[in-house]
Each structure stands twice: as structure tokens, then as C-alpha cells.
């Protein structure tokens, strides 16, 4: 009897532990995007790091960037990490058992401060492999930090982040793949997929009561980097962001660090795609008002963000952890400074 009771108590304890783990994630099944909950700290602030275009088994300074991320993560009391896509090069993962997952993620981002949830979107390189593999729960069994979906929401109380699957927007991937094969199993029709995604995003944005609204995608809307602006996003996604009071759009794709403003809205465009290979050396001509370009760095690095009810602070760092650019804005004072 005692043995049976101990077994029952053990099973109950295990179930309680599982429930504690999964309270971090609250799934909303009412037609909106899947939602994850990240409680703010006791002082009400939220801090995170943004990294993109990184997974190269430590090469191209990926390990050095990871080391500096760990130091900054400790300094800002990191809550979670955001990945803007192109998580594994050159062609994503070939399966959920691909050793590249541990070689480029688990074995690289080992600092204590980085042992938090990683919220990731897919990039175009991820779509060149088995895109479904990165979404698999098998990876979370290997490394519990890993959260990757096509599109979803992270609710951090005063900050709400809307992650958008931008690769299916880009029409040239369907017609001019340059010899690459894309995993379109979940995208049988480009137009219907994008239409449904935009509808779900708009519903989520309109229902948001967050002080700060951030949209995260892989592709840039505004960029003077190698790839430049993404026409489809500017035509189809940007109007929804403007209509719903989005404060920031964060992306990767261009292997650089970058900050640009919008011409006719308060939205700031922040590129963090310098997690490993960078230094392309080519810059697209600025076709908009050059005053809208606040910062550009063609090298490795990452970005941190800290939010309170009234203030936001964005900081860009290089591979040595040196501050390259800092931008602070206040919603109370309704002005910003560089």
C-alpha cells in the first residue's frame, strides 16, 4: 500500500511539474494566432535580445556573438530571446534529428543568461530544408528553450509581439528559386495562405491592449542592405501595421544591423540579421529620405530591447560587445532621441 501511495504521489508531483512548465504557454483556440505568455518582471519591465541569420555551427563569428549575447543578457536581466529567422544554414534542417540543431544552437548559446525561451520565425533558408522539422516538438525535447512556429503571438504584458511568417509573401521564391527547393507543404496556395495570415494578424492586433506592439518577421520592409526592401511586405503587411498602431518592426534577412524610420508613421524598422556571416560590403542606394536612416552597420552583432510602461530602449552591439547605436523613446513625452 505504501509503495502504491508513493507511486501515486510521484505521479502527482510529475504532473504538477508539467503543469508548471506549460503555464508559460497559453494557447488561444478562437481563430487568433497561437499565444505564449511571458510575465513581466516585478518592476514591470521586459527585456530581450534579438538575433538573426545565425546558425553556422559556430563559424563566421557566431560563437563570439553568442558569448557577447550572454554577457549582455546577464546585464539587462534577459527575459527571452527573439530569432528573426534563417536559423540554420545553408538549407535549414533536413529533419528533426539533424545534428545541426545542437551544433548551431544548443552547443553555441550556452551562457546562463541565454537559458530562456527562444521565440523564432522561419527564414527563406529555413524553408529550403524541412521547414516542418523546426516546428516539431521533438526539438523542444532536445532543447526546451526552442519555440518556433510559422506565426504566433508572445504576450509579455505591456509588450505584445506578433511573429509573422514572411517567406511565403515573396513571389520570386515561387518563380525564381535559383536552383533552390522550398518546402511549400503548408503553403499550397500563396494567395490564400497570405490572406488568411493577414486576417489572423489583424484580428490579433485589433484585440491587443498592450502598451507596445511589435511585429517580427524575417524579411525587411525598409533596408539599404543587400536585399533591400521587400515589396510584397510593403504592399500587403505594412498597411495593417500602420492601421493598428504598431510601434516597431523587427527583421533579419540582410546580414547587418540597421535602424530606419518611416516617412508617414511612427513605426521604426529594426534589422538584426548579423548573428554570423556578414560584411557583404554592398549597400542599396537610399531611395527614400536619407534622414530616415538612423544607423547602419555591415558587420556581426545583435540587438537588445528593454521596455517599461513609458519608455523603450533599443541598443545595437558588435561582436566585441561594444555599443554601436542606442535609441530611446518615451510614450509619455511623445518624443524620441538618438
From Swiss-Prot:
Cofactor-binding details, from the entry: Binds 1 Fe cation per subunit. Binds 1 zinc ion per subunit.
Disulfide-bonded cysteines: none
Cofactor(s) demanded: Fe cation; Zn(2+)
SUPFAM superfamilies per UniProt: Metallo-dependent phosphatases (SSF56300)
MF terms in GO: acid phosphatase activity; lactoperoxidase activity; metal ion binding; phosphatase activity
Gene3D superfamilies (UniProt xref): 3.60.21.10
Modes of activity regulation: Inhibited by phosphate and molybdate.
Binding site residues for Zn(2+): 86, 124, 218, 253
Glycosylation sites: 61
Signal peptide feature range: 1-31
Gene induction: By phosphate starvation, during senescence, by ABA, by H(2)O(2), and by salt stress.
GO cellular component terms, A-Z: cell surface; extracellular region
Chief localisation class: secreted
Residues reported in the UniProt entry to bind substrate: 253-255
Tissue-specific expression: Expressed in roots, stems, leaves, flowers and siliques.
Subcellular location: Secreted
GO BP, sorted A to Z: intracellular phosphate ion homeostasis; response to hydrogen peroxide
Subunit text: Homodimer.
Family: Belongs to the metallophosphoesterase superfamily. Purple acid phosphatase family.
Function, as annotated: Metallo-phosphoesterase involved in phosphate metabolism. Has a peroxidase activity.
The protein's name in its UniProt record: Purple acid phosphatase 17
Protein species of origin: Arabidopsis thaliana
Amino acid at each position: 500500500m505504501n509503495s502504491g501511495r508513493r507511486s501515486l504521489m510521484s505521479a502527482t508531483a510529475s504532473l504538477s511539474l508539467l503543469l508548471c512548465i506549460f503555464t508559460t504557454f497559453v494557447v488561444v483556440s478562437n481563430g487568433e494566432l497561437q499565444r505564449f505568455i511571458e510575465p513581466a518582471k516585478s518592476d514591470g519591465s521586459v527585456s530581450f535580445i534579438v538575433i538573426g541569420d545565425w546558425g553556422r555551427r559556430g563559424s563566421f563569428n557566431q560563437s563570439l556573438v553568442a558569448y557577447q549575447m550572454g554577457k549582455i543578457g546577464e546585464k539587462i536581466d534577459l527575459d527571452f530571446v527573439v530569432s528573426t529567422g534563417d536559423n540554420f544554414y545553408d538549407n535549414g534542417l533536413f529533419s528533426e534529428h539533424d545534428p545541426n540543431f545542437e551544433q548551431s544552437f544548443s552547443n553555441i548559446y550556452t551562457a546562463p543568461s541565454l537559458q530562456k525561451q527562444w521565440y523564432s520565425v522561419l527564414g527563406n533558408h529555413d524553408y529550403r530544408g524541412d521547414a516542418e522539422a523546426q516546428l516539431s516538438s521533438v526539438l523542444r525535447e532536445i532543447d526546451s528553450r526552442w519555440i518556433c512556429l510559422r506565426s504566433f503571438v508572445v504576450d509579455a504584458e505591456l509588450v505584445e509581439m506578433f511573429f509573422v511568417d514572411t517567406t511565403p509573401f515573396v513571389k520570386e521564391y515561387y518563380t525564381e528559386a535559383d536552383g533552390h527547393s522550398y518546402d511549400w507543404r503548408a503553403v499550397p496556395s500563396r494567395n490564400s495562405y497570405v490572406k488568411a495570415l493577414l486576417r489572423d494578424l489583424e484580428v490579433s492586433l485589433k484585440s491587443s491592449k498592450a502598451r507596445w506592439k511589435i511585429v517580427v518577421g524575417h524579411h525587411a520592409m525598409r533596408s539599404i542592405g543587400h536585399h533591400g526592401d521587400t515589396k510584397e511586405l510593403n504592399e500587403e503587411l505594412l498597411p495593417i501595421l500602420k492601421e493598428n498602431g504598431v510601434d516597431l518592426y523587427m527583421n533579419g534577412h540582410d546580414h547587418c544591423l540597421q535602424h530606419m524610420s518611416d516617412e508617414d508613421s511612427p513605426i521604426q524598422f529594426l534589422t538584426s540579421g548579423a548573428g554570423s556571416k556578414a560584411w557583404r560590403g554592398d549597400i542599396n542606394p537610399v531611395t527614400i529620405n536619407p534622414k530616415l536612416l538612423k544607423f547602419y552597420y555591415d558587420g556581426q552583432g545583435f540587438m537588445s530591447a528593454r521596455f517599461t510602461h513609458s519608455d523603450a530602449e533599443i541598443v545595437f552591439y558588435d561582436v566585441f560587445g561594444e555599443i554601436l547605436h542606442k535609441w530611446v523613446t518615451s510614450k509619455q513625452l511623445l518624443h524620441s532621441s538618438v
